[in-house]
Amino acid sequence: MRKVLRVKKNIKIARIVPLVLLLVACGRGEVTAQSSSGWDQLVYLFARAIQWLSFDGSIGVGIILFTLTIRLMLMPLFNMQIKSSQKMQDIQPELRELQKKYAGKDTQTRMKLAEESQALYKKYGVNPYASLLPLLIQMPVMIALFQALTRVSFLKTGTFLWVELAQHDHLYLLPVLAAVFTFLSTWLTNLATKEKNVMMTVMIYVMPLMIFFMGFNLASGVVLYWTVSNAFQVVQLLLLNNPFKIIAERQRLANEEKERRLRERRARKKAMKRK
């Protein structure tokens, strides 16, 4: 019973923490050096870092360099999150079998399901919450970076290439690029997933559209951040968690298993003929 309660408690915490982070980060007022809250100070620190990286006063260059720096620092966590999610996907068929086996709602059945699920996680070296920790660490960092671009006045000035960073891109090239890289990152993330679900498939197309239309009205500095961040994620996925290689390896193992079973059947037939 304690194991069941512990699992339920962990699930509740996993749901509440992101909500709390979002509520803490939802301020819209201008952030300055005199801002007193800890969150606003973090936002201002990020803004000063972007300003420091703005060579020749180009805030656009600062946004790009700081975004790349943050993404590089978070890369190990992102990689951990992806690998953990893949492991969870791999054991989903066995988890569903357990859920069918222990479909009852009584306490004893739920306890047995929790025990065997934990045994399955241990067998494959899977921590069901390992994919949540990197996300919880990344979330406040990325929100603080976003707010630095929207709430600190000195980051809303200047130009980069053809755009005024405080205005929307009148050529709409940045929203298009942001949408394209958002699509590629979500598509590549979902590509190697063994079991597709409707929600993920919908998000592959909905997220880029949301980014595209939001980019029409948002400051170009924010859209530039989205573009660079998602472009980095595409490259990162191709280098560290290439879905095409994962699919090819999965197919190779499946073919080897098929060949092994075929050899076993042939060996059994030969043994039967000799008898």
UniProtKB/Swiss-Prot annotation:
Residues carrying lipid (S-diacylglycerol cysteine): 26
GO molecular-function term, one example from the UniProt record: membrane insertase activity
PROSITE patterns: PROKAR_LIPOPROTEIN
A single BP term in Gene Ontology: protein insertion into membrane
Domain of life where this protein originates: Bacteria
GO cellular component: plasma membrane
CDD domains hit by this protein: 5TM_YidC_Alb3
InterPro entries (alphabetical): YidC/ALB3/OXA1/COX18, YidC/Oxa/ALB_C, YidC/YidC1/YidC2_Firmicutes, YidC_ALB_C
A Pfam match: 60KD_IMP
Residue ranges of the TM segments: 58-78, 129-149, 171-191, 198-216, 222-240
Keywords per UniProt: Cell membrane, Chaperone, Lipoprotein, Membrane, Palmitate, Protein transport, Signal, Transmembrane, Transmembrane helix, Transport
Entry membrane topology: Multi-pass membrane protein
Protein name: Membrane protein insertase YidC 1
Taxonomic path: Bacteria, Bacillati, Bacillota, Bacilli, Lactobacillales
Name of the encoding gene: yidC1
